[in-house]
Amino acid sequence: LKDLNIDYQKISLENLIKKTKKRYDVLTCLELIEHVPDPEKLIKDCINITNKKSDLFFSTLNRNLISYLISIIGAEYILNILPKGTHNYKNFIKPSEFFNILRKNSLVIKNIKGINYNILAKKFYESNNPKVNYILHCRKNYD
């Protein structure tokens, strides 16, 4: 991984869009969407800061009973892995809802995977089941 020209920015996306005309080939937005008041605006901002044929990666929590039990009750209240109040269930997004936003903005969905956590091993692992937490890869395909 020598000679990579990586420019890490610690700045809000809104401010970055205002600050620069630069556009990116790859964008990651991980474990953020469920914490913002307007997820669709964030997704659109992510689209606007990327090049015409960019790859975008998003991860978030699915909205269903098992996700609520694991992510809020389990992680925040039983295991105390996360501070209480970290998540608000109403902000969780079902993959189908996420797909609709992406398609509406002309993104092509390439892949979706589940992200699971093994409490005993204290390790995350990938699965084909996006029931609780998931990561998706989509691509801009604008000419």
Question: What is the meaning of each model-derived region?
Answer:
Residues 63, 117-119:
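Residue-level marker for beta-strand->alpha-helix junctions and adjacent short loops that shape enzyme
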Residues 89-112:
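Short alpha-helix
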Residues 1-68, 95-98, 136-142:
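Conserved SAM-binding loop
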Residues 60, 79-97:
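Acceptor-substrate binding/catalytic loop of class I
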Residues 1-4, 73-74, 124-128:
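Short low-complexity, flexible loop/linker segments enriched in glycine and/or proline
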Residues 67-77:
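Short, flexible, mixed-charge acidic loops at enzyme active sites
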Residues 7-9, 110-113:
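General small-molecule cofactor/ligand-binding pocket signal
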Residues 122-143:
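Core SAM-dependent methyltransferase catalytic element
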